[in-house]
A protein has these predicted regions:
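Beta-propeller domains
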Residues: 1-486
Length: 486
């Protein structure tokens, strides 16, 4: 445990470019080098883990920090910045105490006794707008709602009392055809339970369907893919330590290099017992680009590496083995008419070493052409664009001292062709120690940024984010009970 509540760990996760920021700010008219296209009108939201106090344990995982949301509001060639902490129950308790009270990642046995039984949500993994509120998401908790304009925390969000389980994935998908939020929660009947609940939330903000099933073994069920008729779940062996393991000081998750992986295909609006499981040899995936169907075949595009990609969750009792970190965008194809439980094929789609995949969100669940990835080799200073029709990948790289973050696609208009728009991507300038925002023509990133937005502060590296056009960047309309007015 830390010796002082004012001492930050002397580790790579809390020093240099990763040092805490903790700045809640409003900065209008950020400096821009280049020209921001006038058509860009909306907000780029992102969220990072930014501890407000030094952690109780210096060697904890890096993402066990308070959610800090940043909004970049684009309008008329100008950009304004707003950053706010998500005011979770946990955040407010620690702010009142003036120190960290919660212990290791997902380990309640390491908490200060004063917070026993309190919600441990950090709301720090992803943000997106649905039903007129900005949802801050983390997979071990319900969402937290924020006002899309002010970033004021509105409170815990259970979809008007209809959330079917205690958790909600950070990687919910928005169906571009129906407007439904497609989500799930794992460990849905308690920590380390194999139970998963999939659910659909209508644009009116209520769960309209839910189905329960069990995964083959407990694992971190981090992401999913959707098609018009199916939801697809990868299960890879980032397995749980169990309660006794947590009490002994193990991390919540650890890698198992021997177990098979599984891919579950469940009919949307179906029953849990209709899920079909396919298996493949041991390998790793975390984040999903897209999924789509071709007759009775389902294609699932995800970033795959031969071994564990999470250095903070090594095999229990062993140091992290980096030998399997060559991660590439890969297509897994399964045939629902086949009696075979294996994958029909696995196809590497690019040789670019990349993760944090994003496509044009209007094409979620559909056949698609364009995808973008964060370079995941060396200093992680590159952006890749994959053209699946032409089978080519173009790359742009920042200086080696400037690590980049997850890309996000901005469509030129809601009815523009796929890929017609821009990519926005943040980076940390290792020379100035300030954050910058780069804007690229989406299908010509190799030419470099059209514009670079210069921040007067350094923000913590963010995990995920989303774009919302101006029509959705509106104040939340709530009644006295905090319920969204439809």
């Amino acid at each position: 445990m830390q010796d002082s509540k004012h001492t930050w760990p002397d580790s790579p996760w809390f020093t240099g470019l990763n040092a805490p920021c903790r700045v809640e700010a409003d900065v209008n008219d950020l400096d821009v080098v280049g020209t921001i296209p006038a058509e860009i009108d909306g907000a780029f939201y992102r969220v990072a883990a930014d501890h407000q106090f030094p952690p109780r344990f210096a060697n904890d995982v890096p993402f066990n920090g308070d959610g800090m949301v940043s909004m970049f509001r684009f309008h008329d060639g100008r950009v304004h910045l707003k950053t706010r902490y998500v005011q979770t129950d946990r955040f407010k308790a620690e702010r009142a105490a003036g120190r960290a009270l919660f212990g290791r990642y997902r380990n309640k046995w390491t908490d200060d006794p004063s917070v026993a039984g309190m919600n441990r949500n950090l709301a720090n993994t992803n943000v997106l707008i649905h039903h007129g509120v900005l949802l801050a998401l983390r997979e071990d908790s319900p969402p937290v709602a924020l006002d899309p304009v002010t970033l004021q925390t509105l409170g815990n969000w259970d979809f008007h009392g209809t959330l079917p389980g205690p958790t909600c994935s950070a990687h919910c998908k928005i169906d571009p055809h129906t407007g439904n939020l497609v989500g799930f929660g794992f460990g849905a009947k308690g920590d380390f339970s194999r139970d998963v609940v999939y659910f659909e939330v209508s644009p009116q903000g209520r769960v309209i369907h839910a189905a329960w099933f069990q995964m083959p073994y407990f694992a971190e069920q981090h992401d999913c893919g959707i098609t018009p008729n199916y939801i697809v779940f990868p299960v890879v062996p980032i397995i749980g330590a169990g309660e006794e393991g947590l009490k002994k000081g193990l991390t919540y998750y650890g890698w198992d290099p021997k177990r098979e992986i599984h891919l579950g295909v469940l009919p949307r609006f179906g029953r849990g017992d209709q899920i079909r499981w396919f298996t493949a040899p041991n390998q790793f995936t975390s984040h999903v680009m897209n999924a789509w169907e071709d007759g009775r075949r389902v294609h699932f595009d995800t970033c795959v590496s031969p071994g564990n990609l999470f250095p903070f969750f090594p095999e229990f009792g062993k140091p992290f083995d980096p030998s399997g970190m060559s991660v590439k965008l890969t297509r897994w194809t399964v045939n629902l008419d086949s009696g075979d439980a294996g994958f029909e094929r696995a196809t590497t789609l690019t040789d670019f070493i990349g993760e944090f995949p994003r496509n044009d969100d209007r094409f979620q669940g559909k056949p698609y052409r364009h995808g973008w990835l964060l370079g995941f080799s060396g200093p992680r200073n590159s952006l890749g664009h994959v053209d699946l029709h032409e089978g080519r990948t173009e790359v742009w790289s920042a200086p080696a001292t400037h690590p980049v973050m997850e890309p996000c696609f901005i469509p030129r208009s809601q009815d523009a062709p796929e890929g017609d728009g821009w990519i926005v991507q943040a980076l940390t300038n290792g020379e100035t120690m300030l954050t910058e925002l780069n804007l690229f023509e989406a299908t010509n990133i190799a030419r470099g940024p059209l514009a670079t937005v210069k921040l007067p502060v350094r923000l913590r590296p963010a995990y995920h984010g989303s774009w919302a056009e101006s029509a959705r960047v509106k104040p939340a309309r709530l009644n006295a009970e905090g319920v969204k007015l439809c």
